A protein has these predicted regions:
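Glycine/small-residue-rich loop that forms an oxyanion/phosphate-binding "nest" at active or ligand-binding sites
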Residues: 68-108
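Acidic (Asp/Glu)-rich catalytic clusters
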Residues: 23-27, 48-61, 100-101
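Glycine-rich tight-turn/loop motif centered on a GG-T
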Residues: 18, 22, 32-39, 70-85, ...
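Active-site rim beta-loop-alpha module in soluble metabolic enzymes
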Residues: 147-205
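Charged helix-capping and loop-helix junction motifs
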Residues: 122-128
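Conserved, mostly hydrophobic/aromatic
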Residues: 9, 63, 109, 223
Length: 251
């Protein structure tokens, strides 16, 4: 039976602020991307998130972002590649400390927000982030947008990479995501989103915002856990994949 991973972003609370439905979502995903303190999260939340993943048998990933707590890491920055590389190494190391304490491996690394989108298009920045991930624990996998510069950069240095697709995001004809705030950026209708996930999993294609067909490699599907219908949405995606003959399993 073919399989696909379901991943979600986790541990985005910090201080007095609670974001997401972490404990409720985890039983239905197979890997999680934990914020490492730069765009969200704090040491206590990181520790709690790792322990929650261990409880539910979910693979732990680092989710490093730009140093932008106020903007939730979604604002682009003119950051030098060497500085971004150091920032990502720092964040990976912080999460690995909690993984080591909990006795679980650091399975993967997925950049967050603006850093994710910038590295998807910028080959120099992508190469810098791939070097940071390669310096991480042995066998840590890069999780990156399908067809992006990150995937190319990882392949160029022999870094293991899994290609990611999105359940609730619109695509442009070049395979990039429709920018947040633009028309078609978010797929609001659950049935439409689920149908797109099934198509990506079975056929490796998705319809772009201009009506063209984009070819994708779908190793993992990102599902967001911070919306009011997040839990039911994840449950429905998991059930639909199983009904279509696709197992849900970590990459």
């Amino acid at each position: 039976m073919p399989s696909i991973d379901l991943n979600c972003d986790l541990g985005e609370s910090f201080g007095a602020y609670t974001i997401g439905m972490d404990a409720e979502i985890l039983p239905y995903v197979t890997s999680a991307n934990i914020a490492c303190g730069f765009h969200a999260g704090d040491p206590s939340v990181m520790q709690k998130s790792v322990l929650l993943c261990k409880k539910y048998g979910v693979q732990v990933g680092a989710h490093p972002g730009l140093p932008d707590l106020q903007g939730f890491g979604r604002r682009r920055m003119a950051i030098p590649p060497a500085e971004a590389e150091a920032d990502v190494m720092y964040q990976i190391g912080a999460l690995k400390a909690f993984c080591d304490a909990a006795g679980v491996p650091l399975h993967h690394v997925k950049p967050h927000g603006a850093l994710y989108n910038m590295t998807a298009r910028d080959p120099v920045l992508a190469a810098a982030i791939c070097r940071a991930v390669q310096a991480a624990p042995p066998d840590a996998v890069l999780l990156a947008l399908s067809g992006s510069e990150m995937v190319k950069a990882a392949n160029a240095i022999g870094l293991p990479v899994a290609s990611e697709v999105f359940a609730d995001r619109g695509y442009q004809a070049d395979g990039s995501l429709v920018p947040r705030g633009a028309p078609g950026a978010m797929i609001e209708d659950e049935d439409t989103a689920i149908a797109r996930v099934l198509q990506m999993a079975a056929q490796g294609t998705v319809q772009a915002d201009d009506g063209s067909t984009v070819t994708l490699q779908a190793d993992s599907v990102c599902v967001h856990g911070d919306g009011p219908k997040a839990l039911s949405f994840v449950q429905k995606i998991s059930a639909a994949l199983l009904a279509a003959g696709t197992a849900v399993a970590a990459f």
